[in-house]
Amino acid sequence: MNKIIAALVLFTAVIGALADYPAPPPPPPKPYHAPPPPPYHAPPHHAPAPLHPVVHTYPVKAPAAKCGANLLVGCAPSVAHVPCVPVHPHPPPPAHY
């Protein structure tokens, strides 16, 4: 009888040691850190540069201006009057040695 009780105790101990315990809970997930957004670059506010230089000239020489005509000088709205009397150049200033 003692052998049966000893066997029962041993059997209970072995079964207790082999019990299927529940697995430990998984660790909490790591907090998600999103990568920083790319730096903001405003779109350009001008037209892209042309691949070749832009030339704003006529392919031929402009005709001579007539006496008393008004000429548009440059792209700005400024007008130059063509004199009817030739302008004589001023003599050079005297050289100071």
From Swiss-Prot:
- Could you say which residues form the signal peptide? 1-19
Region Disordered: start-end pairs: 26-46
Q: Name one GO cellular component term.
A: extracellular space
Q: Which UniProt keywords apply?
A: Hormone, Secreted, Signal
Expression across tissues is: Expressed in the anterior region of the follicle cells.
Record region (Required for binding to the gut receptor): 20-23
Q: Which family does it belong to?
A: Belongs to the vitelline membrane protein family.
Put simply, this protein is called: Vitelline membrane protein 15a-2
For this protein's source organism, the top of the classification is: Eukaryota, Metazoa, Ecdysozoa, Arthropoda, Hexapoda
Gene symbol of the encoding locus: 15a-2
